[in-house]
């Protein structure tokens, strides 16, 4: 028999300690990540399932957000649940408790995107049998979390890891070292504006969107004190030319954001940054280094193929996740949401592109 509870702040460490050691743990299921999202439009709820001995057996950090116009809530559990996902009795109880919360809060559906490979047919069949609807079957970055990533097994020693890199990757890494690129690892919050300036330069060059600087400040304040976030900066001839942000939780490190200036890209700072982060992950007893998202379209004429080739060079395993699944509580409102949400996102993108175009015109003036 299982029991569920919604936790308050006093039990933050209890929650995190379970998530850290549990199967399918993930930084996006930590208390601090919920706090970060809670600074925006989301409201976090932390649910724990306990057995008769009052020991935790499963957990779920659930984010709730109110939909404009409809006035209803949606639930999202990023990379959740945490626990034995193949224990059907446990999962059945967990989702039944989420249903109760949904009735209380007037939620339309729960979205999950568990840290599970698409090859896990048993879990996919279980979710379908319990009424989950597959959603977000895309090849790019359209989902809430990347569907395709590279993951590097860190259990070999560093010499073996380096030897397994593609020859061109090793060459570029050593080129950066020969050219005198230096990596600053002991970065403080005062270095964050430096990184963000380079990130803005990257977004303008590569034409993708980025969050506001305020969001990065909030991310720093929520995650750095817990030891979950680290900034790396690459310097060449005394000037910052590239940077990365990485997460670390449990036995996994994630490469989250990368940025490079237009100048001096030929000294290959990004390769040395990745190698530095891999060594940092090893020093912190990580077993996995996650390079995060790549496109699922592996055609060489795909504009995102260069990102795939860069990450592939470190000899990680190309991984496709099972994807997003929705557990629908209100079919009528869910139907409205699935039809209106793409239109909403399309108009948001148009507005952003318009603002960028205006910004570009002002610069040319």
Positions of the model-derived regions?
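A structural signal for short, well-ordered beta-strand segments and their strand-loop junctions
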Residues: 108-113, 184-186, 288-290, 320
């Amino acid at each position: 028999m299982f029991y569920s509870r919604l936790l308050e702040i006093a039990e933050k460490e209890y929650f995190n300690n379970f998530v850290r050691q549990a199967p399918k743990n993930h930084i996006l299921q930590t208390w601090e990540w919920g706090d970060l999202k809670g600074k925006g439009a989301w409201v976090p709820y932390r649910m724990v399932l306990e057995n008769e001995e009052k020991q935790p057996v499963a957990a779920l950090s659930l984010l709730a957000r109110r939909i404009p116009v409809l006035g209803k809530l949606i639930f999202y559990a990023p990379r959740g649940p945490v626990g034995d996902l193949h224990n059907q009795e446990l999962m059945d109880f967990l989702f039944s408790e989420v249903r109760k919360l949904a009735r209380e809060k007037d939620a339309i559906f729960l979205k999950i995107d568990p840290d599970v490979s698409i090859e896990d047919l048993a879990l996919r069949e279980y979710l379908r049998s319990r009424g989950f609807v597959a959603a977000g079957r895309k090849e790019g970055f359209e989902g809430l979390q990347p569907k395709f990533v590279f993951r590097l097994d860190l259990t070999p020693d560093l010499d073996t890891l380096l030897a397994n890199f593609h020859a061109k990757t090793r060459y570029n890494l050593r080129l950066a070292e020969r050219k005198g690129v230096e990596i600053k690892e002991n970065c403080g919050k005062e270095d964050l504006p430096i990184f963000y300036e380079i990130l803005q330069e990257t977004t303008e060059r590569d034409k993708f969107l980025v969050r506001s600087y305020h969001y990065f400040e909030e991310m720093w304040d929520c995650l750095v004190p817990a030891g979950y976030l680290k900034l790396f900066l690459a310097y060449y001839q005394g000037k910052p030319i590239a940077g990365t942000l990485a997460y670390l939780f449990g036995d996994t490190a994630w490469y989250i954001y990368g940025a490079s200036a237009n100048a001096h890209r030929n000294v290959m700072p990004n390769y040395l940054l990745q190698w530095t982060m891999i060594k940092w992950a090893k020093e912190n007893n990580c077993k996995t280094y996650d390079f995060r998202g790549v496109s699922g379209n592996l055609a060489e004429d795909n504009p995102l193929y260069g990102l795939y080739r860069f990450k592939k060079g470190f000899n990680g395993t190309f991984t496709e996740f099972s994807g997003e699944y929705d557990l629908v509580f209100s079919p009528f409102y869910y139907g409205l949401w699935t039809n209106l949400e793409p239109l909403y996102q399309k108009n948001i993108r148009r507005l952003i592109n318009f603002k960028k175009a205006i910004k570009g015109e002002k610069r040319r003036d």
